Regions:
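Class I S-adenosyl-L-methionine-dependent methyltransferase catalytic core
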Residues: 1-244
């Protein structure tokens, strides 16, 4: 059966899930998303300037994405096995001195999926492949300690908690086909120590993001009422304070 992008399994279209993930992303020149599915996260985030690499083995989804992003020069959409190409992209771009972010949302482990029997992907991962994926990330971080960042989604499991025990761990309550679940996120870096790739989704909830947006709107309104010289004094002060 052909899976349409709108109802693809595992899509990060749940309320606030994609925004929560994007808010953890540090600034990057290259964005790589293996297991991209219908690319909800990629569609909501700010594009990376150098390249945005979307990889999936589902040919129908890739055809859809190629059509959707055909007008962009900095999008690479591939219908390949990520195990064959992910390492190449990482080594090439980090080797060029680019800041590379890899976001992975692989099919979750069967043991943590309450609806595994009813809902399975066209292309699942074996336990061995999950181990290979986690090992690849750890190995590349040792090889490239700078300019390489990993984020991976999943449900909490013994395998992930043990192999990523020195990573940063976050949880978010969401609604899945099997009911309310706790979405887990592991990052190879501390998100609080890096300039974010974008600040559109700062705030843990929609209500919090709206509160921050209203505050920004009020401050901008006050700023626009000042004289040009006063605006420049504030601008220079902010530059010096933030070291930008």
């Amino acid at each position: 059966m052909t899976m349409l992008p709108g109802n693809y399994l595992g899509r990060k279209g749940g309320s606030g899930v994609a925004q929560w993930i994007i808010n953890k992303m540090p600034f990057h020149d290259v964005y790589i998303e293996p297991f991209c599915g219908c690319a909800v996260v990629a569609s909501l985030k700010k594009m990376a300037m150098v390249d945005n690499v979307l990889i999936d083995k589902n040919i129908d989804l890739i055809r859809f994405l190629k059509t959707h992003y055909s007008s962009y020069d900095n999008f690479t959409v591939l219908n390949v096995d990520c195990f064959s190409f992910l390492d190449t992209f990482i080594c090439d771009y980090v080797g060029q001195g680019k800041k590379v972010l890899v976001y992975l949302d692989p099919p979750y482990l069967p043991e943590v999926r309450s609806d595994y029997v009813r809902s399975q992907y066209e292309h699942e991962l074996t336990m061995l492949q999950h181990r290979q994926l986690l090992s690849l990330m750890r190995d590349r971080l040792l090889q490239f300690p700078k300019n390489l960042y990993f984020i991976i989604s999943g449900y909490k499991s013994d395998l992930y908690m043990s192999m990523l025990q020195d990573w940063f761990y976050f949880e978010f309550q969401t609604m899945s086909r099997g009911g309310v679940r706790i979405e887990s996120l592991w990052t190879s870096f501390n998100p609080d120590e890096y300039i974010k790739h974008q600040y559109d989704y700062v705030g843990s909830t929609f209500t919090e993001r709206q509160r921050i947006k209203r505050k920004c709107d009020r401050w901008i309104s006050k700023f626009q009422k000042l004289s040009f010289d006063e605006q420049m004094v504030i601008y220079e002060s902010l530059k010096n304070t933030l070291n930008i």
